[in-house]
Amino acid sequence: MHTPIKAITLLILILGARQGLAQHYLEVRGADTKYRYFDWNYTFANSALVDMFYVGVPGSNEFNLGGGYGFKPKPCLTLAPLVYAVIGKEAEQRGIKIALLVMLEKEGWKVNSFLGHFERISGDVDDYQVLDTLDVSRVVHGPFEVGFSSGFFRAGGKWNPQNGPLFKLNDRLGAWYVSWRFGPDNELRFSRNFLFK
């Protein structure tokens, strides 16, 4: 096992050993492009977090295990730098992903963004950058939100941007999302998340 992956594993074990009030977050996504995503993260009372997610598209199945810390420069804003060990099923992919999670809620507006950079350690998968996703929404009535969803995947100097409308329905367990994004590959995406305190 490479030294960076050992360091990330140790960080996750240390963070996982802390005691305190916790918050679990689960999310499942799917799309007509055969995109699939499963995420579980655990945030401690001290804002340290552990995150594990799987993302798959045709020809790629990637597992990410990492963690980080959430900073709140303002009560409405959370910035969470994250580091992941990345293992891909195909092409003997191994690497590190450095990411930034941004969450903002203010006066009915909500912004959520995950921006990441994958750095290859071994295997045949090139370095890449990903925005998955940038969602901007506004509460319009009760549990309903409308907004805009944007994302991209950049590898080998080639971009695959997607942009389009977003609709969201909140309930006591989390939220349902649907977005219709346009770009080189149009995508109808569905998502469900759960938040447990």
Q: What is the predicted role of each segment?
A:
Residues 1-25:
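Cleavable N-terminal export/targeting peptides
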Residues 26-31:
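Short strand-turn segments of transmembrane beta-barrel domains in outer membranes
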Residues 32-49, 58-63, 70-78, 89-197:
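Outer-membrane beta-barrel transmembrane domain signature
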Residues 69, 83:
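Acidic (E/D-rich), amphipathic helical modules within compact regulatory domains
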Residues 84-88:
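Extended, low-complexity, charged alpha-helical tracts
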